[in-house]
Amino acid sequence: MDTLNFKYVFLGQSILRYQVPLEIFHIINSIYENKYPELKPANKQLVGKIEKEHSLFFNGEDSDKMIKHNYLPTNVLMWFESMFRHYLKFNRIKGYKLHFNSVWVNQMFEHEYNPVHVHQGTIYTGLSSVMILKLPESFGVEYSAAAAPQNGRLQMLGATNGQFANVDYQPNITERDFYIFPYDMRHCVYPFNGPGWRRTLAANMDVDYDPIRNRGVS
């Protein structure tokens, strides 16, 4: 078995998990905490059943839901772009144009949740993300099946199906995790119970590309 010569071929969408540099992590948390009274509520354009949803960056079309603004320094914006470019390079996507659309923070308390949803920006093709900024000490009591905890979990639901396919992903999240995935990948966050809060960030990057040109690229 050690001498097998094989090549791994993956058909489907990918999720990449990164670790946020401490400097970026602390800057984002500090901006959220210190600028909180100034931050614009993002609830009108989000599906989450969450009271505290606030925007740090928006570069889409002005509307009654949101207008352009930015609370993030250049080095943080550049870091986000570099991560999205890495995802596209890893997935061998060529000939694309980027437009950084939005960044917001969800601070969830017990019983709040994010139902199954997808993302979009100015266009329908692009990459979204989840960054773990703060976690409570515990997600509370699991009232059944404690060996398979669900409280507070992030769940990604892939579009791939068929025999032997991995159809969902539910990571053991830790602070400084950063997950990048396509706009149309369904995902959700389950509620938790007990004290504390769960603070996460989402960032949307529009990716204008030709799927025909990129078909079968290797």
Mark where each language-model region is.
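Non-heme Fe(II)/2-oxoglutarate
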Residues: 1-94, 111-114
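Residues at beta-strand starts and edge strands
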Residues: 12-14, 99-101, 125-127, 197-199
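A short coil-to-beta-strand element that immediately follows conserved catalytic motifs
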Residues: 93-103
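A short alpha/beta connector and helix-capping loop motif
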Residues: 195-205
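Double-stranded beta-helix
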Residues: 204-218
